[in-house]
Swiss-Prot record:
Keywords assigned: Aminoacyl-tRNA synthetase, ATP-binding, Coiled coil, Cytoplasm, Ligase, Nucleotide-binding, Protein biosynthesis
Family note: Belongs to the class-I aminoacyl-tRNA synthetase family. ValS type 1 subfamily.
Disulfide bonds: none
Entry-linked Pfam families: Anticodon_1, tRNA-synt_1, Val_tRNA-synt_C
The record's note on its domains: ValRS has two distinct active sites: one for aminoacylation and one for editing. The misactivated threonine is translocated from the active site to the editing site. The C-terminal coiled-coil domain is crucial for aminoacylation activity.
Name this protein carries in UniProt: Valine--tRNA ligase
Subunit structure: Monomer.
Biological function: Catalyzes the attachment of valine to tRNA(Val). As ValRS can inadvertently accommodate and process structurally similar amino acids such as threonine, to avoid such errors, it has a 'posttransfer' editing activity that hydrolyzes mischarged Thr-tRNA(Val) in a tRNA-dependent manner.
Presence of the UniProt keyword ATP-binding in the record: yes
Motif stretch ('KMSKS' region): 520-524
Span(s) of short sequence motif 'HIGH' region: 44-54
Residues where ATP binds: 523
Amino acid sequence: MEMKPKYDPREVEAGRYEEWVKNGYFKPSEDKSKETYTIVIPPPNVTGKLHLGHAWDTTLQDIITRMKRMQGYDTLYLPGMDHAGIATQAKVEAKLNEQGITRYDLGREKFLEQAWDWKEEYASFIRAQWAKLGLGLDYSRERFTLDEGLSKAVKKVFVDLYNKGIIYRGERIINWDPKARTALSDIEVIHEDVQGAFYHFKYPYADVEGFIEIATTRPETMLGDTAIVVNPNDERYKDVIGKTVILPIVGRELPILADEYVDIDFGSGAMKVTPAHDPNDFEIGQRHQLENIIVMDENGKMNNKAGKYEGMDRFDCRKQLVEDLKEQDLVIKIEDHVHSVGHSERSGAVVEPYLSTQWFVRMEDLAKRSLDNQKTDDRIDFYPQRFEHTFNQWMENIRDWTISRQLWWGHQIPAWYHKETGEIYVGEEAPTDIENWQQDEDVLDTWFSSALWPFSTLGWPDLESEDFKRYYPTNALVTGYDIIFFWVARMIFQGLEFTDRRPFNDVLLHGLVRAEDGRKMSKSLGNGVDPMDVIDEYGADSLRYFLATGSSPGHDLRYSTEKVESVWNFINKIWNGARFSLMNIGEDFKVEDIDLSGNLSLADKWILTRLNETIATVTDLSDKYEFGEVGRALYNFIWDDFCDWYIEMSKIPMNGNDEEQKQVTRSVLSYTLDNIMRMLHPFMPFVTEKIWQSLPHEGETIVKASWPEVRESLIFEESKQTMQQLVEIIKSVRQSRVEVNTPLSKEIPILIQAKDKEIETTLSQNKDYLIKFCNPSTLNISTDVEIPEKAMTSVVIAGKVVLPLEGLIDMDKEISRLEKELAKLQSELDRVDKKLSNENFVSKAPEKVINEEKRKKQDYQEKYDGVKARIEQLKA
């Protein structure tokens, strides 16, 4: 297969993915004797297109799956998408609002039709993006969290947990999103520090002079106050416990009660109790059997319990209420106060603690089982391990999970209420006399169905499902550390509860993709990067390799166009190295022609040794998910060892007349390049397939080729030391040429004073490499080389490298040239020093600019020191 002179990712990638899918390369093996390896994709939300975080996530999964397939596993990489209840509903509602329509105008059924249309549109976008990324997914098994099979699983789980008493319906304080008009779980609330105020009010005693001072950050909730509490041990209030105060504005009498919850040392030591609008107040209210007065509606507006403030937005009510209290001289003081305020993760609205009847999951026993499991052989391994502590901590402090949502898009709760008796029926099927029942209108939290993803996608609850029996538990979960609580923890406790096994063996957690300056990528900052744009510019292989190797497990990744471009340059280097190799291997060279038992040269032995070392390193690091280190190992071997050294060294036999040696070199080139392609394939699937198809190969695709294995018979330890000596000598000669301003094209005499006879013999046997890379007019290698008076000498491991200077350069002219260069460098150093010592510049210039100046100074100083040393050497 022809390779064009220049690497063009568009040409390389065009049609390749479609060919892989069409030929069924990503389907599991039909050989059931193979060990299985399963990854289920973390389902992206159908709210929109994939971002760089998704690209990173799925690239890592695809790398692991491709590698395991090559290692002989029966692999399944299962695709799917999440309905993303609140997020998708918000998108669809926003689209309708543009047309002046609300979901209530349409009604539930018509609205859901719109939501399904949205899902289909964005699902097709997502599949197209998966294809561009080259993900080896088995589309015949694609799942969606609202499809029939998963809906069946959701109903069974809900009903089973309800029957066990783990799911219950109750009235509690929940997090209410007044914009989305739905309940939220604790982890869907983002806490942000907000500049607010502490309002100190007078609550007058009902039957005596005086008042109790009460402080609050939410004055609007006082309209729902039902008591004042003080600590029974607080001497200040001993005489007033049991008395009453008048609730300002409202005029309602509130009892003064004793409760040890109150902190004597905080504020006045007295606090108001609003059971319907604060979780702690609710608990106090339960203990003292207080009335629950809800003063807001679901939109965050004051209701008819708020008196004259009815219909006002909660924050407008706050302002007006404070003004009214001022008029009645009931405001003691208002203090500025920065405090943590909960915001909806999805809508951004300030979350309201709100008394509501919802469905909950009782978490204590589920959490305990998850924690206990981590002490058994069935434990889940976290990468990095520190996240296991994060998981354990959360499980130890978990609260009951609010699972009902006041939405239409999602799994409708399988609970019905009898129209006459109010009886609750919970079941996988609707009641037979459905006309007498009304189904609960709420839907389940999106994460409820996502928590079942590893087993529901494989056919559960059908325990006889072939996929469930063969591919569960899954092997690895790859996801961001930001959803340990949302998703990872919930999959673990649901997996243990319903399958009695961990849902996955390993959890590999990565960080967030950040902008180059370290800030989070966001629409508001305008610093987001579309992965498809990157692919259009540099190709999928460049993006994949950057994402996979640019960070270590658990750490964030800074996106850098420059680094993606450097990967593109790396692929170009690979492409050019492959083209050279293929031209020398020849079209007639076949797999069976590869013979590594012949007369291997030093370069052959060395590159085969380094190849085997790299195979061992890459395999070991990949098993630990250390793909950043894998990237470095591959880069160093391919760029430095193979392309820069071996390919150049292979030109010696290939340009010679020894046909037997040429055939050996062809074998080594072919074998090494083939193994490089196999190691690179999981990272760069497109370009490796293209090059591999051009190489002598067996099989129809590199996708199904075997993973490289270490061959002990092709490890020649002694070659490494000899090659190290040669490379050091070559680098020394080239550096000396630069220092005396003599180009490589000019032949010069070179002397090598070997440290001992053994080294002399070794270097003499391999002098062809020194001649090729150093271009000497004469080359003298000996233990007793006489070093001329005027010479440039470098000490190396093998001895000394000597360049006689007599007749090579005009010493006086060279010293004069170097002194002028030194003066220029001194001038540049002075300029940079002046800039960096200028306080005005340092205080105003961006950090990037200052760092660039510091880098320049370091470069100039190194050059200055080098030139000065050369002058001193020449003068000596």
